[in-house]
Amino acid sequence: MKILAILALVATIAGAGAVLYGINTLAPQVVQTAANVTEAQSVADTFDDMVTRLENGTFGGRIFGGTDDLRAEDCAFVTYTVRMQNKGFFPAEWISMELVEPKDGDVLALPDDSRHALAAGSVGDMQLTVLRRTDEEEQADTARTLRVTCYVFGRKIVFDVSVA
């Protein structure tokens, strides 16, 4: 009887530990961030397609500033990459990213219509691409704060990430 009581106590402690671990690891953790600048002239097809969609009213992304008189030689695409790790027991689903506060020169964010998920115990990358007008002073300024939103086990989780 004493051995059975000890086994029940050990099982209870192990179960409580597993529950506490699961609660504490619901939110994915940010492992790494990066910003990559690509001149719009070097990806002219993407730029031209985006301008056409803006003119037709079919652009599905988020517009921050004036889209008038966009020229490839005056713009650059900044791709923000956030690497996340999901240490929890449940997958992180419907992951999305957006700029918290666009800066001067940010024109729009390209649409991302895919459904992103991060399986339990895995690592994955999320990307957000922003078109910005470039000039000599602001060209090197890629620091932004991104808001990541996801759902884990039906619970909405929102956190901010700084990318330099």
Segments (PLM) and residue ranges:
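Short acidic, flexible loop segments centered on an aromatic residue
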Residues: 87-105
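Asparagine-centered strand-capping/turn motif at beta-strand->loop junctions
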Residues: 76-91
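Short extracytoplasmic
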Residues: 39-77
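Hydrophobic core residues within well-ordered beta-strands of beta-rich domains
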Residues: 78-80, 124, 144
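Intrinsically disordered, low-complexity Pro/Gly/Ser/Thr-rich segments with frequent PxxP/GP/PP motifs
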Residues: 106-136
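Terminal connector regions
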Residues: 134-164
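Beta-strand elements of well-folded, non-transmembrane domains
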Residues: 86-88, 101, 130-134, 150-154
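Membrane engagement elements in two modes
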Residues: 1-55
